[in-house]
């Protein structure tokens, strides 16, 4: 189907987003065309502002507008515990329950041979460096309860065993195959309470 070039480019841009197929991209493009210009400009500014002003914390890998992030900078946090998660959205999910007071380490992915993602493609080396520098007594593996998350947790567990650090895994109150970011606070809280040593 023929669209004027500006609409085609907008549709193509929307299709670059995860979960957006051709039909949804067309629907979004026409929705944007019907929005007031000031709303569209605010939306565009928000996109540019986020891209320009957000970075990843050099310590934990969480998304932040200043380095180090507010969590790593907080002196009241328990620095003897690091919770390892796959994605910055998982940090936000954990923080919502307001029960965990340690630090985080964001892997930015999980081991997935089917997708060509190996241990060297995620932030495992950075985690090992942190364990050398900090007085960490426990590492909580809070990767997603799916095949990739489990494989990643087991890989990290084997790497960390010789260090003598206590290694725990969050309990499976979370649905297998689900993502941490979609879990409610009560489920996350129970999963954290029921973590087990590996």
Curated annotation (Swiss-Prot):
Kindly give the SMART domains that the UniProt entry links to this protein.
TOPRIM
According to the UniProt entry, its GO molecular function terms are: DNA binding; zinc ion binding
Q: Where is the Toprim domain?
A: 80-175
- Which keywords appear in this protein's UniProt record, sorted alphabetically? DNA damage, DNA recombination, DNA repair, Metal-binding, Zinc, Zinc-finger
**Job description of the protein:** May play a role in DNA repair. It seems to be involved in an RecBC-independent recombinational process of DNA repair. It may act with RecF and RecO.
What HAMAP family does the annotation carry? RecR
Protein family according to the UniProt entry = Belongs to the RecR family.
Q: What is this protein called?
A: Recombination protein RecR
Its source organism is Anoxybacillus flavithermus (strain DSM 21510 / WK1)
């Amino acid at each position: 189907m023929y669209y004027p070039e500006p609409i085609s480019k907008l549709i193509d841009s929307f299709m670059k987003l995860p979960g957006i197929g051709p039909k949804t991209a067309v629907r979004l493009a026409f929705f944007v065309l019907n929005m007031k210009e000031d709303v569209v400009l605010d939306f565009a500014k928000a996109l540019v502002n986020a891209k320009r002003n957000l970075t990843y914390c050099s310590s934990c890998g969480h998304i932040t507008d200043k380095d180090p992030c507010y969590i790593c900078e907080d002196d009241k946090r328990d620095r003897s515990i690091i919770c390892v998660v796959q994605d910055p959205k998982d940090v936000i999910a954990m923080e919502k329950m307001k029960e965990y007071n340690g630090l985080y380490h964001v892997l930015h992915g999980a081991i997935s041979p089917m997708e060509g993602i190996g241990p060297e493609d995620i932030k495992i080396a950075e985690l090992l460096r942190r364990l050398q520098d900090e007085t960490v007594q426990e590492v909580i593996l809070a990767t997603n309860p799916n095949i990739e998350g489990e494989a990643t947790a087991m890989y990290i567990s084997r790497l960390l065993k010789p260090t003598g650090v206590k290694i725990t895994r969050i309990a499976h109150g979370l649905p297998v195959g689900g993502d941490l970011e979609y879990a409610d606070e009560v489920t996350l809280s129970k999963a954290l309470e029921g973590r087990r040593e590996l």
